[in-house]
Amino acid sequence: MINKKVEWDRNKEEGFPRVTIDNFLDQETCMKLYEECVNTPKGGWTVFTRAGSRMEEFNDLISLPTAHRVTYDIMHSGEFLYQLENMTGIVGLLPDPHLVGAGYSILRKGTILSPHYDFNWNDRLRLHRKLTGILYITPDWKSEWGGHNVTWNGNPELDSTAQIVESTAPLFNRFIISENVLKGPVHSVSKVDCPDDVYGRCAIRFFYYVST
């Protein structure tokens, strides 16, 4: 990921540090994540709702072999944390072994996430959330199906002058990572409008923390 440092630094200078990495995992592993996600027993899912938004979440990955391996052997590994630190310049990054708010997520057809900013304090870890990573895993996703991750320079629901900084399509095996700041970045997800036979916009999320 060190080759993404220039992109990260450029976006940071503009006030919105983030990068997009395509073909992040090998195709087979990413497909296994998708199959595991859509076949996970319904009883373990929670539903997040707010102001017309709706997202399904599943973070008990201990019984899911592919997600467990990818999370703890790759995304939480010392090697990956070292790469993140080199790319972002943020030292002392720590993963969350409890996956508070992380893990699988699904946005089904017709759903959105309205503009908001994420929590940046993990009360269980007593740490500040610094980075958010999202890996999109629905195969053959098309840009016109929506579900884009939209970054704003303000909250359009509170500020009529707020504008879109970037809109990123949730293409299969695309990984995006962005820096969390106090009350930011404001982001949303555009309406998911996939065909009826597509399960939805599926992803797996990873959060990273610092002590100060």
Give the location of each predicted region.
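Non-heme Fe(II) oxygenase catalytic core, chiefly the N-lobe of the double-stranded beta-helix
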Residues: 38, 74-128, 140, 144
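Generic structural "secondary-structure junction" signal
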Residues: 27, 60, 76, 106-109, ...
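Non-heme Fe(II)/2-oxoglutarate
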Residues: 1-88
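A structural signal for well-ordered alpha-helical scaffolds and beta->alpha junctions
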Residues: 26, 30, 68, 77-81, ...
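Short, well-ordered beta-to-alpha junction loops that form the rim of enzyme active sites
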Residues: 23-24, 100, 117, 181
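A structural signal for short, well-ordered beta-strand segments and their strand-loop junctions
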Residues: 20-21, 46-47, 94-99, 103, ...
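Catalytic core of Fe(II)/2-oxoglutarate
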Residues: 111, 118-129, 139-212
